[in-house]
């Protein structure tokens, strides 16, 4: 998903609003995970806007499906951001040579874009693994039992339910070691600027809206709706809530 979305964003990078959209794709690193999880429940939960789609296929958000959706939503916008950056980092000379040789479509993707994407895949996979490995809220909310667990949840259970501090410390130590190993792998791989768009000059001309790109626009729209619908759902439910002002000025909220 990240590769396809990044490719489409890069292909239509001259459309107004694409740059702010790309910059906003880092939102999953800023927002608390619980907000995304609550947004997913608002969309796909038992009383969610799109729950009827899951019912058609006899699917339930509470289980492995919810865990997968949550982690896809938490990771694919950021992955898209990284891949888009790698495409922007391709030198002007490479784009110029490709255009001179008449490359386009799949040939251009295979010759220029794919090598740029391929070299950062190990870095992206390492980053996603670390984020999923340390996941807590999505697994404990959608998993709801011992069938789905992570080290984070095992530590939580050891402290809260078993009162076994030795076990919790041992699990935490194992988690630190594993994270350090993958962090070292990440640091020794290609350095990527996650939050700054490249200023490299990319060959191309500004494109106008065209009927031949309808399929691209539809895919972009689907990706955007999928990525941002949980946030929109949270905002809408918050605005419509009659208790919003009461909670906002409550003593517990002000203390927090």
What name fits each language-model region?
Residues 189-218:
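Flexible interhelical linker loops that connect adjacent transmembrane helices
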Residues 1-88, 116-143, 168-187, 211-239, ...:
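Membrane-water interface segments at the C-terminal ends of transmembrane alpha-helices
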Residues 90-117:
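Short helix-to-coil transition segments within interhelical loops
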Residues 42, 137-163:
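Glycine-rich helix-loop "coupling/hinge" segments at transmembrane-helix boundaries
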């Amino acid at each position: 998903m990240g590769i396809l979305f990044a490719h489409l964003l890069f292909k239509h990078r001259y459309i107004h609003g694409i740059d702010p959209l790309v910059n906003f794709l880092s939102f999953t690193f800023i927002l608390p995970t619980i907000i995304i999880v609550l947004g997913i429940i608002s969309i796909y939960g038992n009383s969610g806007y799109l729950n009827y789609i899951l019912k058609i296929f006899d699917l339930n958000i509470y289980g492995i499906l919810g865990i997968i959706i949550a982690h896809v939503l938490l990771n694919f916008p950021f992955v898209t951001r990284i891949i888009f950056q790698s495409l922007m980092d391709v030198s002007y000379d490479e784009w110029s040579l490709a255009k001179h040789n008449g490359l386009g479509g799949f040939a251009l993707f295979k010759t220029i874009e794919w090598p740029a994407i391929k070299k950062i895949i190990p870095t992206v996979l390492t980053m996603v693994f670390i984020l999923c490995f340390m996941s807590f809220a999505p697994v404990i909310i959608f998993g709801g039992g011992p069938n789905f667990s992570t080290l984070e949840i095992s530590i939580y259970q050891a402290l809260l339910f078993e009162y076994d501090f030795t076990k919790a410390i041992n699990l935490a130590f194992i988690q630190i070691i594993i994270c350090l190993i993958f962090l070292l792998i990440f640091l020794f791989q290609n350095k990527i600027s996650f939050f700054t768009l490249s200023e490299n000059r990319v060959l191309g001309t500004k494109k106008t809206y065209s009927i031949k790109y309808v399929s691209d626009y539809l895919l972009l729209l689907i990706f955007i709706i999928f990525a941002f619908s949980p946030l929109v759902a949270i905002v809408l439910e918050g605005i419509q809530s009659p208790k919003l002002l009461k909670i906002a000025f409550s003593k517990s909220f002000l203390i927090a």
